[in-house]
Amino acid sequence: MNPLRIRNFLLLSVWATACLTGFLLLWNYSFTPGETEEAPLKIPSHFQDGRFHLLMSIHPRCPCTKASLAELHRILAKTKGKMGVSILVYMPRGEQREWQNGALLNEAKSIPAVSIISDQDGKIAESLGMSTSGAVCLYDKDGNLRYSGGITASRGHEGDNHGKSIILSQVLGKTTGMEKGIVYGCPIQNNPTDS
């Protein structure tokens, strides 16, 4: 056999293996859900306003959050004021000034009729069972939990997904009951992007 052919075959094999390995690592990362905790069955009273209310927790340095905010925009366009929204923005204690600006935080602030709440050290999110950026809890008009989970199909990917469908169905009166979903995103606390 020709040594040049053997070398080319080996190079092609190494290249193909590297490409496949990279693809599998990316696939695994994209579809590995974040941690979830049990959300309270009743909304904290200071969030209740007589209509559906969605609470979302975000880490302003998590790149996955951009897709969650885009999906929130889509949900709000279809629910047309039938739901209040509060976004809990993780802020580490003593570093608020450095964290006050940023593309994701500015994007969250640009969403009309959404309340932005600075969540120092993620304590509010933690009390609501939200430990992953992009986690949401939907509560009905009576303050009962109707959905907890995420609103993206994988990390950082926009498009149709189970969580968004459930929220739309609940708010638009097509279904009732409580459902849970998967959250894809970065951890709210102890996030490697914090440093």
Label every model-predicted segment.
Residues 46-72, 82, 86, 167:
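Short active-site neighborhood of thiol/selenol oxidoreductases, capturing the structured segment around
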Residues 104-139, 145-146:
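Short, internal strand/loop/helix patches
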Residues 59-69, 93-97, 184-195:
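Short, thiol/selenol-centered motifs that function as redox-active sites or metal-ligating centers
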Residues 8-27:
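Hydrophobic membrane-insertion alpha-helices, especially the h-region
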Residues 30-43:
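Alpha-helical transmembrane signal-anchor/signal-peptide segments
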Residues 1-6:
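Short, Lys/Arg-rich N-terminal segment immediately upstream of the first membrane anchor
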Residues 146, 150-195:
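Thiol-/selenol-based redox modules, centered on thioredoxin-like
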Residues 66-108, 123-127:
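Structural microenvironment flanking redox-active thiols in thiol-disulfide oxidoreductases
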